[in-house]
């Protein structure tokens, strides 16, 4: 029992000793020890004549610009005592005095590299500049402000290189010794070698078993296998390039490749040549090569008598002697599958390196893929424009990914296409506006996106052309069968169906406008005089002028909608009952506004807002009787001699004098007042219809007129009263109950969903909101009454599932009410239908 205890105790002691030993061994830093020894030696040389060596010695061990570290170590064993961090703008360290003192002057740069000497650098101390050198096999890295090991592949082309003692210490043992390696520089490791890759990186490789690295040839060679063996001895050695009819045998103490007789193959199991198919003895899955196939091909047995030819990117030979495909297809274009492949992205506008791949023997050993995601993304500018260009977040620069800028991205074209979001009018603006690459720099600098966009675009109107080629920015006449610019809609081009030849250019003057849904692109409106034209010169202001409204005060024309509606209403509300006799003269004509200013006065009529306090005639004077209708004549008639008249279908206003009767009218016997009351009721007097002014509201999508709202002024009491009655007695179809408030504006339309379209109409008798048999328009967005989410019609309002038509300036959104003017009639027209 005592012997076992002693054995266990001995094992424990040995283990403890081993742990302590290896701890000391692995923690020992030979480089640090050498540095401290030199520091101690230098201090002793310069001070031992005056003072003894201190127990703890400090020295500046690291410098980071104005920050430096003082390392303190014990002088008896050179072990670490402690470290302190200091700022040289505050205090400096005196090595000989071993103490700190206040900084006397500010030094802008403490450490600087030496351009011609990679291992040297200059340190500026309090006494001046001192040139220092890194240890051998080190170079100074100014970016890290320290000495770093030299790159083992620096100055070497890609390939295989032998491993000397220096490479073994630094790459295998990870030790950077300060010793001199020149004595054993010609000695190399027998199987390890250095593989330098195309990108300057490196890897340590080892030859297979029974192979030795040939330093001169730079490749692994098989060891001699025939030492002490007779000639003709067949070796169980099957190198990768050995054909199916070949084998290796010994001759004169060396191994050579021999061949079987014609028609024979070498059976590696029997170790002899045989007359048989290569698959006969090995079966399915066996692989072999012949002299008539390529270096990347091999045969694979399907059964005992059939084989298929397999073609690879790279043919590999496994430890089991079988062939297999290996390698990455991406390395196939590199010589011998080895080298560096930089990925270059090229489009119509930019070119940049997006990454790189390093291949070694058809295998990818390293790969860098930068984040080339579009930094602009799917961002919309001014809520409708998208840049049809990709600018990466990162690019490859100096072998690493770096933020993309116009300095590391090549500009191939100064302009790029711009797309616009789909709209209800099908307007494609890619020929109207193109982007300038200067926009990208502004966006990358953090400028306001919309401002950067608007200030860096080229407009077709700027170069006086109908359209621009989206990719080259050159002026064009055709881009498909039709070409127009909604930002400059005073003309349009009609081209052949192929879009190659221009047929004609349509100019839009007064009364005409661009109508995108018509084959001839021409719409007509007598009131329209290019009111949607944009007068800005700044591209930023132009591209922002996507939706606006123009208001125009003008005259009611004889043939416009105001005249038609008011004439119909006037006739309805001034038509007498059968017991009255219709006056053929006064009510068969309508007073209208001439092209020039003209005032038409009503016949002896007192308006509701009249302020005349004295009578214009004697009410009790004897009245004369009109022979034509039997009614008493007016005592005051300013139109007794003539009247301005405009007949429906006539050619304007003209003066029509009254024709005197050819013979005197016989006087009628006076009748008693009682008889007049009982036999004849007098026809009531109505104020004449005066058609004078109207307000027009044109909604514009850029220079494309979309909706026209006519606000017809009523200057007649009959019309004002009629409007009040019509609005108070609106008829509504059951399906259009939610849209009943469309009645404020005639011809207003709203789609309420479920295939129901409602429209406000005047049928000659009443105002009604009716359901259309087939909806004129079906909208996916009920709130905006559009399909693209844009509210083009500013006069139709939607709130809480209810629909109202009201001039935009009269609409009360909070109360969902229309403050319609009592003396105005509103009519809405879709100009792009």
UniProtKB/Swiss-Prot annotation:
<feature type="glycosylation site" description="N-linked (GlcNAc...) asparagine; by host">
    <location>
        <position position="588"/>
    </location>
</feature>
<keyword id="KW-0946">Virion</keyword>
<keyword id="KW-0863">Zinc-finger</keyword>
<feature type="disulfide bond">
    <location>
        <begin position="207"/>
        <end position="220"/>
    </location>
</feature>
<dbReference type="Pfam" id="PF01607">
    <property type="entry name" value="CBM_14"/>
</dbReference>
<feature type="glycosylation site" description="N-linked (GlcNAc...) asparagine; by host">
    <location>
        <position position="609"/>
    </location>
</feature>
<dbReference type="Pfam" id="PF08475">
    <property type="entry name" value="Baculo_VP91_N"/>
</dbReference>
<feature type="signal peptide">
    <location>
        <begin position="1"/>
        <end position="18"/>
    </location>
</feature>
<keyword id="KW-0862">Zinc</keyword>
<feature type="glycosylation site" description="N-linked (GlcNAc...) asparagine; by host">
    <location>
        <position position="408"/>
    </location>
</feature>
<dbReference type="GO" id="GO:0005576">
    <property type="term" value="C:extracellular region"/>
</dbReference>
<keyword id="KW-0325">Glycoprotein</keyword>
<keyword id="KW-0147">Chitin-binding</keyword>
<dbReference type="GO" id="GO:0008270">
    <property type="term" value="F:zinc ion binding"/>
</dbReference>
<dbReference type="InterPro" id="IPR013682">
    <property type="entry name" value="BaculoV_Vp91_N"/>
</dbReference>
<dbReference type="InterPro" id="IPR002557">
    <property type="entry name" value="Chitin-bd_dom"/>
</dbReference>
<feature type="zinc finger region" description="C2HC BV-type">
    <location>
        <begin position="147"/>
        <end position="196"/>
    </location>
</feature>
<comment type="function">
    <text>Probable capsid-associated protein.</text>
</comment>
<feature type="glycosylation site" description="N-linked (GlcNAc...) asparagine; by host">
    <location>
        <position position="413"/>
    </location>
</feature>
<keyword id="KW-1015">Disulfide bond</keyword>
<keyword id="KW-0677">Repeat</keyword>
<dbReference type="GO" id="GO:0008061">
    <property type="term" value="F:chitin binding"/>
</dbReference>
<feature type="glycosylation site" description="N-linked (GlcNAc...) asparagine; by host">
    <location>
        <position position="180"/>
    </location>
</feature>
<feature type="glycosylation site" description="N-linked (GlcNAc...) asparagine; by host">
    <location>
        <position position="210"/>
    </location>
</feature>
<feature type="glycosylation site" description="N-linked (GlcNAc...) asparagine; by host">
    <location>
        <position position="199"/>
    </location>
</feature>
<feature type="disulfide bond">
    <location>
        <begin position="260"/>
        <end position="273"/>
    </location>
</feature>
<dbReference type="InterPro" id="IPR036508">
    <property type="entry name" value="Chitin-bd_dom_sf"/>
</dbReference>
<keyword id="KW-0732">Signal</keyword>
<feature type="glycosylation site" description="N-linked (GlcNAc...) asparagine; by host">
    <location>
        <position position="137"/>
    </location>
</feature>
<feature type="region of interest" description="Disordered">
    <location>
        <begin position="647"/>
        <end position="673"/>
    </location>
</feature>
<feature type="domain" description="Chitin-binding type-2">
    <location>
        <begin position="223"/>
        <end position="281"/>
    </location>
</feature>
<keyword id="KW-0479">Metal-binding</keyword>
<dbReference type="GO" id="GO:0044423">
    <property type="term" value="C:virion component"/>
</dbReference>
<protein>
    <recommendedName>
        <fullName>Capsid-associated protein Vp91</fullName>
    </recommendedName>
</protein>
């Amino acid at each position: 029992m005592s012997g076992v205890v002693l054995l266990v105790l001995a094992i424990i002691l040995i283990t403890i000793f081993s742990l302590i030993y290896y701890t000391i061994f692995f923690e020992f830093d030979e480089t640090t020890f050498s540095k401290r020894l030199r520091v101690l030696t230098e201090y002793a040389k310069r001070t031992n004549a005056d003072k003894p060596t201190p127990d703890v010695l400090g020295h500046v061990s690291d410098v980071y610009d104005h920050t430096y570290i003082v390392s303190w170590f014990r002088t008896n064993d050179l072990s670490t005592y402690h470290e302190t961090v200091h700022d040289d703008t505050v205090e400096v360290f005196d090595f000989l005095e071993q103490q700190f003192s206040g900084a006397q002057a500010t030094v802008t740069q403490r450490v600087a590299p030496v351009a011609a000497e990679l291992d040297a650098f200059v340190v500026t101390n309090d006494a001046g500049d001192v040139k220092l050198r890194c240890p051998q096999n080190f170079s100074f890295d100014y970016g890290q402000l320290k000495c770093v090991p030299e790159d083992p592949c620096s100055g070497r082309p890609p390939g295989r290189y032998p491993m000397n003692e220096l490479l073994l210490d630094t790459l295998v043992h990870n030790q950077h010794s300060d010793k001199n390696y020149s004595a054993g520089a010609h000695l190399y490791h027998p199987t390890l070698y250095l593989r330098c890759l195309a990108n300057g990186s490196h890897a340590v490789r080892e030859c297979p078993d029974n192979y030795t690295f040939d330093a001169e040839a730079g490749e692994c060679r098989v060891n001699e296998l025939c030492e002490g063996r007779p000639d003709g001895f067949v070796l169980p050695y099957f190198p990768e390039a050995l054909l199916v009819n070949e084998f290796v045998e010994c001759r004169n103490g060396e191994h050579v490749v021999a061949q079987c007789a014609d028609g024979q193959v070498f059976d590696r199991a029997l170790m002899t040549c045989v007359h048989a198919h290569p698959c006969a003895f090995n079966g399915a899955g066996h692989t072999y090569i012949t002299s008539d196939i390529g270096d990347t091909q091999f045969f694979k047995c399907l059964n005992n008598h059939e084989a298929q030819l397999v073609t690879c990117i790279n043919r590999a030979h496994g430890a089991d002697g079988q062939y297999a495909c290996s390698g990455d297809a991406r390395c196939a274009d590199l010589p011998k599958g080895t080298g560096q492949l930089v990925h270059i992205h090229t489009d119509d506008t930019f070119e940049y390196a997006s990454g790189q791949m390093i291949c070694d023997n058809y295998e990818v050993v390293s790969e860098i893929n930068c984040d080339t995601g579009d930094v602009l993304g799917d961002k919309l500018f001014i809520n409708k424009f998208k840049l049809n260009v990709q600018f990466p977040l990162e690019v490859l620069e100096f072998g690493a990914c770096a933020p993309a800028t116009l300095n590391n991205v090549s500009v191939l074209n100064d302009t790029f296409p711009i797309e616009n979001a789909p709209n209800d009018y099908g307007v494609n603006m890619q020929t109207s506006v193109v982007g300038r690459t200067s926009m990208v720099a502004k966006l990358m600098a953090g400028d306001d996106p919309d401002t950067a966009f608007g200030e860096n675009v080229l407009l077709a109107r700027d170069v006086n052309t109908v359209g621009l080629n989206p990719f080259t920015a050159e002026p064009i006449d055709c881009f498909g069968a039709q070409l127009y610019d909604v930002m400059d809609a005073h003309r349009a081009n009609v081209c052949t169906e192929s879009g190659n030849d221009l047929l004609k250019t349509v100019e839009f003057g007064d009364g005409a406008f661009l109508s995108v849904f018509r084959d001839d692109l021409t719409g007509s409106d007598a009131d329209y005089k290019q009111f949607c034209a944009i007068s800005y010169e700044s591209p930023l202001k132009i591209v922002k002028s996507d939706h606006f409204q123009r208001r125009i005060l003008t005259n009611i024309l004889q043939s416009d909608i105001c005249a038609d509606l008011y004439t119909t209403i006037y006739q309805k509300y001034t038509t007498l009952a059968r017991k009255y006799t219709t006056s053929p003269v006064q009510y068969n004509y309508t007073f209208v506004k001439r092209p020039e200013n003209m005032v038409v006065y009503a016949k002896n009529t007192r308006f509701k807002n009249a302020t005349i306090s004295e009578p214009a005639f004697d009410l009790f004077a004897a009245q004369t009787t009109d022979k034509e209708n039997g009614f008493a004549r007016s005592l005051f008639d300013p139109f007794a001699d003539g009247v301005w008249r405009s007949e429906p279908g006539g050619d304007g206003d003209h003066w029509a004098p009254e024709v005197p009767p050819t013979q005197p009218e016989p006087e009628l016997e006076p009748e008693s007042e009682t008889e007049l009351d009982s036999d004849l009721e007098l026809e009531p007097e109505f104020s004449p219809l005066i058609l004078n002014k109207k307000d027009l509201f044109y909604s514009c999508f850029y220079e494309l007129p979309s909706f026209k709202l006519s606000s017809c002024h009523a200057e007649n009491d009959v019309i004002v009263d009629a409007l009040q009655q019509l609005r108070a007695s609106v008829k509504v179809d059951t399906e259009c109950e939610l849209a009943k408030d469309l009645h404020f504006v005639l011809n207003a339309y709203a789609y309420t969903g479920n295939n129901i379209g409602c429209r406000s109409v005047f049928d000659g008798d009443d105002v009604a909101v009716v359901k259309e048999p087939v909806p004129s328009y079906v909208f996916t967005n009920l709130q905006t009454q559009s399909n693209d989410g844009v509210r083009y019609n500013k006069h139709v309002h939607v709130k809480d599932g209810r629909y109202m038509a009201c001039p935009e300036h009269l609409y009360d959104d909070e109360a969902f009410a229309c403050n319609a003017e009592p003396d105005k009639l509103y009519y809405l027209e879709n100009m792009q239908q």
